[in-house]
Amino acid sequence: MIHADHDDNLPDDEEGLPLPPSKSQRKRDMHALQDLGEQLVALSVDQLKKVPMPEALADAVREAKRMTKHEARRRQMQYVGKLMRHIDPEPIQAQLDVFNGLSKAEIARQHRLERLRSEVLDDEKVLQRIVETWPEADFQQLRTLRRNALKEREQNKPPRAFRELFRVLRDLDVGAAAPPADEPRDDDEE
C-alpha cells in the first residue's frame, strides 16, 4: 500500500524525485519529433532555409527530400527524428506555425477578393466602394472588365475578363494592403 497516498499528477519515486517518462510516453515523443521532421521534409527549399536548425539536421532533411525508395526514406526519417531528440524543437515548430499561418492568411485573402469580384458582377455600385478603398483604382477599367465578364458569362465564353478582374483586384489589394485595413478603424474613431 505504498501508493495509497500517491498523487497521480506528480509522479515521484521513493526519494521524492520525478520518475522518468514511461516507455510509451517516450515513443509518443519520438513519433511527434518524427512527424515534425516529416513537416520539414515537405517544405520548399526556400522555406527550409528560413527554419532555424543545426546543419546536421538540415543535411538529413535535404537527404530525405531526395530519397524516393519507401524503406530508405523511412529510415532517413527515423534518423531525422533521432537528430531532433538532441535539439529544442520549439523554434522549428514556431517557424512551421508561421508558414502555416501565412498560407491560411493568403487563402482567406483570396476568398475575400473572390467575394468582392462576385459583388462587383452583381452590383455596379460596388465599383465606387472599390475606388474609395483604393484611390489608385481605375474606375473605367473596372467597369469595362465588369461589363465584359457579364457578357462572357451570358454568351458562355471563356471567363477571360472574369479572371482579369480578379487579377486587378488582387494587384490593388497587394499594392495597398495596409490602408484598407486601417480605414474602417479611422472612420470608427471619428
Swiss-Prot record:
Keyword rRNA-binding among record annotations: yes
Pfam families, per database record: DarP
One GO CC term on file: cytosol
Principal cellular location given in the protein's record: cytoplasm
Gene3D superfamilies referenced in this protein's UniProt entry, alphabetically: PSPTO4464-like domains
GO biological process, alphabetically ordered: assembly of large subunit precursor of preribosome
Keyword tags: Cytoplasm, Ribosome biogenesis, RNA-binding, rRNA-binding
Record-level Gene Ontology MF annotations: ribosome binding; rRNA binding
Key word Zinc present: no
Alphabetized InterPro entries for the sequence: DarP, DarP_sf
Disulfide bonds: none
Coiled-coil ranges (or none): none
Location in or out of the cell: Cytoplasm
Region: Disordered, residue numbers: 1-31
NCBIfam families: PRK05255.1-1
Function according to Swiss-Prot or TrEMBL: Member of a network of 50S ribosomal subunit biogenesis factors which assembles along the 30S-50S interface, preventing incorrect 23S rRNA structures from forming. Promotes peptidyl transferase center (PTC) maturation.
Stated family: Belongs to the DarP family.
Protein name: Dual-action ribosomal maturation protein DarP
Organism: Aromatoleum aromaticum (strain DSM 19018 / LMG 30748 / EbN1)
